[in-house]
């Protein structure tokens, strides 16, 4: 027999998941989006207070994702898996953005800024990107060196 509860949080994650599936993060407050993202690393704990604390400290989701792993673990009690998941977010965004770019390999000035910008998403250390092209404007090589 199913247990009934008067817990106000009962079904909260499912409601949030449905809200996301129907609308994406456009209808979420920033703390709600972070709270939901944390569900996947912290499956049995209310992640709302943690999302608020992280945003109070780091101001933005970008700030949270750029925070040092050891700091996230020590100061917020995150497991290494939870901290690593946050660090993966910008890296996955970069991979996603790069994969959506035109693959015709023709360099044009209109897209050059977008191409370079995408390559630097999620990078926290100084780095250099090298793009090589031929005389016809075809990209031969583009990567972080």
Briefly describe each language-model feature range.
Residues 1-72:
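Long, highly charged, low-complexity intrinsically disordered interaction regions
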Residues 53, 71, 85-88, 115:
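Generic beta-strand or strand-like secondary-structure segments
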Residues 82, 87-92, 125:
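Structured, non-catalytic alpha/beta "coupling" segments that mediate domain-domain communication
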Residues 97-145:
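Conserved beta-strand-loop surface patch within small alpha/beta domains used
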